[in-house]
Regions:
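Active-site-proximal specificity loops/subdomain of glycosyltransferases
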Residues: 44-84
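Short, solvent-exposed loop/turn segments at secondary-structure junctions
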Residues: 9-12, 39-42, 58-61, 95-100, ...
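GT-A fold catalytic core of metal-dependent nucleotide-sugar glycosyltransferases
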Residues: 77-121
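Conserved glycosyltransferase catalytic-site signature
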Residues: 68-76, 96-97, 203-208
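N-terminal anchoring/stem segment of glycosyltransferases
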Residues: 1-61, 238-242
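A glycosyltransferase accessory/donor-loop signature
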Residues: 175-257
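Conserved catalytic core of nucleotide-sugar-dependent glycosyltransferases
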Residues: 103-197
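Nucleotide-sugar donor-binding/catalytic module of glycosyltransferases
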Residues: 4, 16, 74, 97-107, ...
Length: 257
């Protein structure tokens, strides 16, 4: 069973409406849409789809991330998705993305394997800033950028293995993101890396964490696929810039076809 999983927050609700409408129009092969958002603001969606909404309180702590503790908390929620659904698999997407054509969840399977997309670090451009945080988390030199696409397909089995590994090595996902990874943000680093010149004060990213875990420790369920073969019809935007009129026009026209 496959669910679609979205971690959002009130500032992204306007984007989420379009994301949900695009799923309704274009996506098949899943059971439920599972949404986790911050407590305090009710999320109301006008949709006939099967949607389950969970509310979580933000931790009452400060964090060195420039946008506050919500960024790290969202990563923790995404990597602990098994708390919110009993699905065997989930597709994670961000609320500011939007499908633009038909796709079935079977796309993410190839034979008896699941697809996880990557690119070489040499191909990552500005994404190279994630190399040192990835090396720090995985406790070895990473070889690939595992976050080049805007959709990510998780399995319960491998996620639970990942969670166990993080518990054993870092004391849990939230403990890693909120305690150990703080040094990545503050640049007060207590470890060595051959790529330290690429580090610009960015913390670990959840999909680099999971993708490198797959590559180094438990690749059994997955086939690593180069991003050049990525064919998901999706539009990725950046909600921090706000939803501009031209973007609204594009989305409305697409959904009306």
């Amino acid at each position: 069973m496959i669910d679609i999983f979205i971690k959002t927050y009130p500032g992204d609700f306007i984007w989420l409406e379009y994301c949900i409408k695009s799923i309704e129009k274009f996506v098949t092969g899943y059971r439920d849409i599972v949404i986790v958002t911050d407590s305090g603001t009710e999320l109301v969606l006008n949709s006939e789809l099967s949607i389950k909404i969970f509310y979580e309180d933000l931790p009452n702590e400060t964090h060195p991330c420039p946008v506050g503790i919500g960024y790290a908390w969202a990563q923790s929620v995404k990597l602990n998705w098994t708390k919110y659904t009993d699905a065997d698999y989930i597709l994670q997407i961000d609320s500011d993305t939007m499908f633009t054509n038909n796709i079935d969840m079977s796309y993410y399977k190839t034979g008896d394997k699941l697809k996880w997309f990557y690119r070489e670090w040499s191909e990552s451009g500005e994404g190279i800033i994630h190399r040192v945080p990835t090396d720090f988390f995985i406790k070895r030199e990473s070889t690939r950028d595992h976050m080049p696409s805007p959709t990510w397909f998780f399995s319960r089995k491998t996620t639970e293995l990942f969670q166990n590994w993080v518990n054993e090595n870092w004391g849990g996902i939230w403990n890693y993101l909120n305690v150990h990874a703080r040094q990545l943000w503050t640049m007060d680093l207590n470890f060595e890396s051959a790529h330290m010149s690429t580090h610009k004060g960015w913390g670990s990213c959840e999909y680099h964490m999971y993708g490198n875990f797959i590559e180094f420790f438990h690749p059994e369920e997955y086939e690593l696929v180069h991003i050049s073969q990525y064919a998901v019809p999706i539009r990725q935007s950046w909600s921090w810039g706000g939803l501009k009129e031209d973007e609204i026009k594009f989305r409305e026209e697409l959904l009306s076809k």
